[in-house]
């Protein structure tokens, strides 16, 4: 089987992290985001994976060659010279996706969930249509494009309603699909949207179905959602692989700590925290709902909440970071500084308070 991951461009929504590391390699749950997807595809029997990118970061090539060996898959880049939307990349990767008659998976690289690829493939085969969209239920459907089903046929999609004013349903497109190779024939080689141009044709042909996703789902493409997604992910791990979480007298709730990290006995970590390799946490530090990336240090008596601390960064003593603050790579926050919703660019040193949302350049 085959899979296409829509990686896209420069990950601008996740800046400042993506100023130094390509978005697919930013660690989510202490593993590069894209590795969650490659592993799930490989476990479902996928052997050919295409990454649809606008640029081909050389740093990604090396990492992905390692994953090819580890998971026994072939990973190729499909590089767009101009952005091709969400359907154009399928046409561009036609050679790989149509190399046999088996269906192929398509997924958005920002989506983190319990990827149901095996069940999705079985469901797709059983209904015999040309495409299946994974659907997730949401509390506020008025913000999204909502899937409306055919009354007579279970799971057959009748239409999509964009940001409905009145309630028509609560299932939305989760950004994961399985499609038959002939669907590529419906796509032209130009900027095209799979959601607004390709799927309506399949709906008209009565050949597009939806599959309900169990468990959590999150588009983690921006810092606020990256943190919310981390909460959901850790909750899922606590149920399915509790041994991956860290326990201890100074650990509260769901916390994942790399074994190489050093945490002072009087620090308190959690709930909903991920701490990366070679991180140092000082005495009396309090961390909640945050991600601390590798080689960083949080010094004594600082409070860190709803924050992403970038690689090789240092938070001084008696600091307070909150309000979806994001420190880029190699940032220094001096002692006794308050940062509330600051986005601090790489290699910056800050010694003044940031009382409200701001970009520190």
Swiss-Prot record:
Its EC number is 2.7.7.13. GO terms for cellular component: cytoplasm. The keyword Cell cycle applies. Keywords: Cell cycle, Cytoplasm, GTP-binding, Nucleotide-binding, Nucleotidyltransferase, Transferase. GO terms for biological process: GDP-mannose biosynthetic process. It is found in: Cytoplasm. Belongs to the transferase hexapeptide repeat family. This is Mannose-1-phosphate guanyltransferase 1. It comes from Candida glabrata (strain ATCC 2001 / BCRC 20586 / JCM 3761 / NBRC 0622 / NRRL Y-65 / CBS 138) (Yeast). The gene is MPG1.
């Amino acid at each position: 089987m085959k899979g296409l991951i829509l990686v896209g461009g420069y990950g601008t929504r996740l800046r400042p992290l993506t100023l130094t590391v390509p978005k697919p390699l930013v660690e989510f749950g202490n593993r590069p985001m894209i590795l969650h997807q490659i592993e799930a595809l490989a476990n479902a029997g996928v052997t050919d994976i295409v990454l649809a990118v606008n640029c081909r970061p050389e740093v990604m090539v090396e990492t992905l060659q390692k994953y090819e060996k580890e998971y026994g898959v072939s990973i190729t880049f499909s590089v767009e010279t101009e952005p091709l939307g969400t359907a154009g990349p399928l046409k561009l990767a036609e050679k790989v996706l149509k190399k046999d008659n088996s269906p192929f998976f398509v997924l958005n690289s920002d989506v983190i969930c319990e990827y149901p690829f095996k069940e999705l493939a079985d469901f797709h085969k059983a209904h015999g249509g040309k495409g299946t969209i994974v659907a997730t239920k949401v509390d506020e459907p008025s913000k999204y494009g909502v899937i409306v089903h055919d009354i007579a046929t279970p799971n057959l999609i009748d239409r999509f309603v964009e940001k409905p004013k009145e309630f028509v349903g609560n299932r939305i497109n989760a950004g994961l699909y399985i499609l038959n190779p002939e669907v590529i024939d419906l796509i032209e080689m130009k900027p095209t949207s799979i959601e607004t141009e390709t799927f309506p044709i399949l709906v008209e042909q009565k050949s597009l179905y939806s599959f309900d996703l169990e468990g959590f789902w999150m588009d983690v493409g921006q810092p606020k959602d990256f943190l919310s997604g981390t909460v959901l992910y850790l909750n899922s791990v606590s149920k399915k692989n509790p041994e991956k979480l860290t326990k201890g007298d100074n650990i509260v709730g769901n916390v994942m700590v790399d074994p190489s990290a050093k945490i002072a006995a009087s620090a308190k970590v959690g709930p909903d925290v991920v701490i990366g390799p070679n991180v140092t946490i000082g005495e009396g530090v309090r961390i909640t709902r945050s991600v601390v990336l590798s080689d960083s240090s949080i010094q004594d008596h600082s409070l860190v909440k709803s924050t992403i601390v970038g690689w090789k960064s240092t938070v001084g003593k008696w600091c307070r970071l909150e309000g979806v603050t994001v420190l880029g790579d190699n940032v220094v926050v001096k002692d006794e500084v308050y940062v509330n919703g600051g986005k601090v660019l790489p290699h910056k040193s800050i010694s003044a308070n940031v009382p409200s949302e701001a970009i520190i350049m």
